Amino acid sequence: MKSVFVSGSISIKTLPSEVIKSFDKIISQNIQVYVGDADGIDILTQNYLASKSYTNVTVCTIKEHPRNQASNLFNISRVNYDETLKSHREQQTFKDIYMTNNTDYSFVIWDGKSKGSFSNIKRAFKENKKLKIYYMSIDRCLLKEELTPSSIENIYKSNTGYTPSEIVAKIKTSNIYTNISKVSELKEWFINHKIFKQTQNKLEIDSKYKDYFIVENYRGSQSIKYKKGVLELINENSIFGQRA
């Protein structure tokens, strides 16, 4: 019997029509569905399959009882994990690995930025599983030619950004003419080019360049991630010197 691991982002609140059509095909072919017990896509998938009285479903959990279970007729599989791990995300990864390894293909409904879904996609590539990805931002499934590790990486990083150390690493392996070799020099470069302005414990970004960055503020702390276009910005200004 064919089987599919359905996963996706917790941020998603409703099932897109194209995803529903895919679920209907799964039902018509009596494909066994493996799904987790989280909010978001997990419970949306469970609810839809339960509404169709489809019970060829296995809900996987690391808990004694699933956090979400839409039907008492669903099978339950309790997955063991390393109990010494304190990170909830790392604990849940054991469940995702189990579902990837025990199914024929993966169907991921993704917002483009959830790390768990990104990891499931990468794992499917690594294990040579058949893969289908519905990308919410473009309201469709990715085409065959778009299903490559590099394309998925670009989608993820365009939504979540690169860390300063990742940008420095890319500069080092590029043809960009610059003396940036560490994170502190990257920050200094942006300040010198008047793209960043240091104000007390925060950095302000010139409004003309806001689209190059992703700013996150959490509990009074600021973090800045960089979009890929930052490399072009550095390249242009490194070649022609500082802006007047």
What are these regions, as identified by a protein language model?
Residues 1-2, 147, 242-244:
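Short, Lys/Arg-enriched, disordered terminal segments
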Residues 2-10, 36:
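Short, hydrophobic/glycine-enriched beta-strand segments
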Residues 3, 57-58, 212-213:
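Structural motif
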Residues 12-146:
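Acidic/glycine-enriched connector segments
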